[in-house]
Amino acid sequence: MKKRIQKTILTVLFSSLSSIAFADMQSIAELQRRLEHVAQYSADFEQTVRSSKGQQIQSGRGKFQVKRPNLFRMDINAPQENVIVSDGENLWFYDPFVAQVTVNSVQNAVNGTPFVLLTSSDKQHWTQYEVTQNADTFVLKPKSAKNNLRQFDVQIDQNGLLKGFSTIERDGQTNLYRLRNITTADLSADLFKFSVPKDVEVDDQRRVKK
């Protein structure tokens, strides 16, 4: 009798886990389908940063540009200038205020920079997250406890139009990005190339062994 009960419990548990995994795969496939529907776009964004208690602590604005596959650029104009560029292989973060560039490989950066997923079809990238869907909102949660993020939400309609995205960090701080003035005009590949400015320090994280 005891063995029968244990077998029943294991069967139910396995069935539940299989259902969750299948739903996760469905959500990933649907999100990828929507993201791939629009090959390139440019948009202005407004950023709102809130503390874990919900208090607004910062706001910002800038431009977000994507060209699939694997290319994106984010120009942050306020509260201070920053530039983030993915050239498909490397992820560049330029902070003019401190005259420093940090560069990492896209493969290594996907954990801490989920924006990479908005342009990637690499299965290795997607397997690092659990994905659930609620209408036009997709919730991505990193599987690794070492990830600095707790959650990454993507708002995208069935036609592939990205409306916004948000992150929740481990400490509860949230970053909300709302997109507007979205266009799908052709974007030059030169936008996604980064040249290190003169007299700027380079922190090359590609050399750091994981």
UniProtKB/Swiss-Prot annotation:
<dbReference type="GO" id="GO:0044874">
    <property type="term" value="P:lipoprotein localization to outer membrane"/>
</dbReference>
<dbReference type="InterPro" id="IPR018323">
    <property type="entry name" value="OM_lipoprot_carrier_LolA_Pbac"/>
</dbReference>
<dbReference type="GO" id="GO:0042953">
    <property type="term" value="P:lipoprotein transport"/>
</dbReference>
<keyword id="KW-0653">Protein transport</keyword>
<keyword id="KW-0143">Chaperone</keyword>
<comment type="function">
    <text>Participates in the translocation of lipoproteins from the inner membrane to the outer membrane. Only forms a complex with a lipoprotein if the residue after the N-terminal Cys is not an aspartate (The Asp acts as a targeting signal to indicate that the lipoprotein should stay in the inner membrane).</text>
</comment>
<dbReference type="GO" id="GO:0030288">
    <property type="term" value="C:outer membrane-bounded periplasmic space"/>
</dbReference>
<keyword id="KW-0732">Signal</keyword>
<dbReference type="InterPro" id="IPR029046">
    <property type="entry name" value="LolA/LolB/LppX"/>
</dbReference>
<comment type="subunit">
    <text>Monomer.</text>
</comment>
<comment type="similarity">
    <text>Belongs to the LolA family.</text>
</comment>
<feature type="signal peptide">
    <location>
        <begin position="1"/>
        <end position="23"/>
    </location>
</feature>
<keyword id="KW-0574">Periplasm</keyword>
<protein>
    <recommendedName>
        <fullName>Outer-membrane lipoprotein carrier protein</fullName>
    </recommendedName>
</protein>
<dbReference type="Pfam" id="PF03548">
    <property type="entry name" value="LolA"/>
</dbReference>
<dbReference type="InterPro" id="IPR004564">
    <property type="entry name" value="OM_lipoprot_carrier_LolA-like"/>
</dbReference>
<keyword id="KW-0813">Transport</keyword>
